[in-house]
């Protein structure tokens, strides 16, 4: 049985025989794994460590073309005590970086044309803005052998956000050390 359905037709589980006793009767609006009769493993999120007091108020630039991710990260980062600067593409990010002077940037690797995350990092450098970067992406494939001093880490959007936020103090301290050594 094909899992594709015609418009307006209810989704029919390919496992209909084993689904007869539940509320959906084999016609669940969502794929079978969401059937109320089947326990779905749940891993609770990791607790997010509080932001060290000396880092509260640090500016984080978030660059992502997906509005939902920008909202999630902005909400979390503000709750953690950071100032947040938002951009949905590389052009906006360059303007925000110039105006807000972020201490760290969280950049989606797969930004829309004309400039992806790497292109944005290179353009920031060309403009004299050395900002530690945490790249994150929906694609779990990261470059291997990249030893770039401005890249603090690569994260998949599928991982627990606590892991992403744990990199922020490292990146901000690196940014402050660099600024102190240059002045």
Question: What do the predicted segments below correspond to?
Answer:
Residues 70, 112-114:
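The feature encodes the CheY-like receiver
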């Amino acid at each position: 049985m094909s899992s594709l359905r015609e418009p307006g037709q209810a989704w029919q589980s390919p496992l209909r025989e084993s689904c007869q006793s539940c509320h959906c009767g084999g016609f669940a609006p969502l794929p079978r794994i969401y059937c109320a009769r089947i326990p779905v493993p749940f891993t609770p999120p990791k607790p997010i460590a509080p932001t060290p007091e000396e880092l509260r108020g640090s500016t984080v630039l978030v660059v992502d073309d997906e509005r939902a991710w920008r909202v999630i990260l902005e909400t979390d980062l503000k709750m953690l005590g950071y100032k947040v600067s938002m951009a949905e593409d590389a052009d906006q990010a360059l303007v925000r970086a110039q105006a807000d002077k972020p201490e760290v940037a969280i950049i989606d690797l797969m930004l829309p044309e004309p400039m992806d995350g790497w292109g944005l990092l290179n353009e920031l450098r060309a403009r004299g803005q050395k900002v530690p970067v945490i790249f994150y992406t929906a694609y779990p494939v990261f470059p291997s052998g990249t030893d770039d001093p401005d890249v603090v880490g690569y994260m998949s959007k599928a991982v627990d956000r606590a892991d992403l936020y744990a990199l922020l103090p490292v990146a901000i301290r690196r940014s402050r050390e660099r600024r102190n050594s240059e002045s």
